[in-house]
From Swiss-Prot:
Its EC number is 2.7.7.6. This is DNA-directed RNA polymerase subunit alpha. It comes from Helicobacter pylori (strain J99 / ATCC 700824) (Campylobacter pylori J99). One of its GO terms (molecular function) is protein dimerization activity. HAMAP family: RNApol_bact_RpoA. GO terms for cellular component: cytoplasm; DNA-directed RNA polymerase complex.
Amino acid sequence: MKVIKTAPLIPSEIKVLEKEGNRVKISLAPFEFGYAVTLAHPIRRLLLLSSVGYAPVGLKIEGVHHEFDSLRGVTEDVSLFIMNLKNIRFIAKALVGQDSSLENQSVVVDYSFKGPMELRARDLNSDHIEIVNPEMPLATINEDAQLNFSLIIYKGMGYVPSENTRELMPEGYMPLDGSFTPIKNVVYEIENVLVEGDPNYEKIIFDIETDGQIDPYKAFLSAVKVMSKQLGVFGERPIANTEYSGDYAQRDDAKDLSAKIESMNLSARCFNCLDKIGIKYVGELVLMSEEELKGVKNMGKKSYDEIAEKLNDLGYPVGTELSPEQRESLKKRLEKLEDKGGND
């Protein structure tokens, strides 16, 4: 029998459908019609943006002064060494379990290797560090050569460009971009379910994969907890009758838009395509129309689709309509970044 409700149905079922390695499929139900996508999308965004991981943000190599130096007795130059280092996923054992509300949680580790040897991620395992992708290559050290370096590994979330970590670095350390998120992929599906013979209810199925720094189910629970805390503030505090200007909203969005395109983790082909035309920041892509992006030299369908997907994940689909004020504010911000050489 149909009824006229005065309150939405509260979901009562959460199931782990599959669990294999660093991947999990979770089912949540039942939801009122339209509620599933309303909740699934922000949870997905929070998984990507607020999941806590570990990354090296400072590097000191004996005998090296900047990232364009060569490494004596090592096949790779410093730039390639750094690129390989960024592909390695760390767990800083001393920081596991510490209160995530504490800022600037870090650990310093020192390494010394003598050639000849093929240095791989597993060689960085120690009493303080656990490597979750041990087979990743790092460097080729030639005979009679020695490689001494130190890392500063931070606990954090999201992506932090090197410009923002420069002031944290002790003398002699090169700042690195920090890609902290341990989430490799998260997608969801919405399905209809029967509740007392009524098919107009929904179920969310999340498919979550991490890089091994965190269990995927724990990552899901953590994202839900973050969402609950963010929304809970409205029930705990009176909402002031304050008018917010457009500039305030634009400043709030600007964190994503002023990030470098490296933060999007694009394929090399895709990145080079944008780099050749001087695109440095996410905001520059947001300002481009669909036709402009497709018209970029060597921009094939595969590259376009990749960029479109990444922008959509950030909440700025290709061709996002901005008000004249927003476009002007964003352009000025990007010009300011260029004038400062990328430092904001």
